């Protein structure tokens, strides 16, 4: 016998499963692809789960499922997940402190650019050959000072649309 190469996908079938598959091929059942998990629930809420099953469908709408069935204890999984969430989650007081700290840091960062922008606005800028109407239009559309509007118009060679777009970013 030759060795099975590494990384190959080999499925070993027992005698009964092999016979069942041969009968299915004779019955004309169609294989359904793309099913990752099948679960069956009994009356007492006991759940049987089959991961990566092979599912076949008959013409009448019945299904045949091949795979290893395992008893799925959903309540244990749920309890473990809740325990994990509780160990990771913070108390409301800790969350409030984190939010306050983040707000304080954001407030400090936003105050610095605003102060720098005010300093830029104080220095008068020469309008040159730009019309007062263009400056007013850019300033009002972009919600900026006239000095910023003049600078943007000069950067874009008097192009109103590009100046407004640059200031709106």
UniProtKB/Swiss-Prot annotation:
UniProt-annotated location(s): Cytoplasm; Nucleus
Keyword presence, Transport: yes
InterPro entries linked: EGD2/NACA0like, NAC-like_UBA, NAC_A/B_dom_sf, Nas_poly-pep-assoc_cplx_dom, UBA-like_sf
GO annotation, biological process: protein transport
Residue segments, region Disordered: 85-128
GO cellular component, one term: nascent polypeptide-associated complex
Keyword terms: Cytoplasm, Nucleus, Protein transport, Transport
Assembly and binders: Part of the nascent polypeptide-associated complex (NAC), consisting of EGD2 and EGD1. NAC associates with ribosomes via EGD1.
Stated role: Component of the nascent polypeptide-associated complex (NAC), a dynamic component of the ribosomal exit tunnel, protecting the emerging polypeptides from interaction with other cytoplasmic proteins to ensure appropriate nascent protein targeting. The NAC complex also promotes mitochondrial protein import by enhancing productive ribosome interactions with the outer mitochondrial membrane and blocks the inappropriate interaction of ribosomes translating non-secretory nascent polypeptides with translocation sites in the membrane of the endoplasmic reticulum.
Family, as annotated: Belongs to the NAC-alpha family.
Protein name: Nascent polypeptide-associated complex subunit alpha
């Amino acid at each position: 016998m030759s060795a099975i190469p590494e990384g190959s996908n080999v499925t070993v079938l027992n005698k009964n499963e092999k016979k069942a598959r041969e009968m299915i091929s004779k019955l004309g059942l169609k294989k359904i692809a793309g099913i990752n998990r099948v679960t069956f629930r009994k009356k007492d809420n006991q759940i049987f789960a089959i991961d990566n099953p092979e599912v076949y469908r008959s013409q009448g709408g019945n299904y045949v499922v091949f795979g290893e069935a395992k008893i799925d204890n959903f309540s244990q999984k749920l309890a473990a997940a809740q325990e994990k969430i509780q160990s990771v989650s913070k108390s409301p007081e800790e969350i409030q402190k984190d939010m306050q700290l983040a707000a304080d840091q954001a407030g400090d960062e936003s105050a610095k650019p605003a102060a720098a922008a005010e300093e830029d606005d104080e220095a008068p800028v020469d309008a040159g050959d730009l019309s007062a109407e263009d400056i007013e239009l850019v300033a009002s559309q972009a919600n900026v000072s006239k000095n910023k509007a003049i600078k943007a118009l000069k950067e874009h060679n008097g192009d109103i649309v590009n100046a407004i777009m640059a200031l709106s970013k």
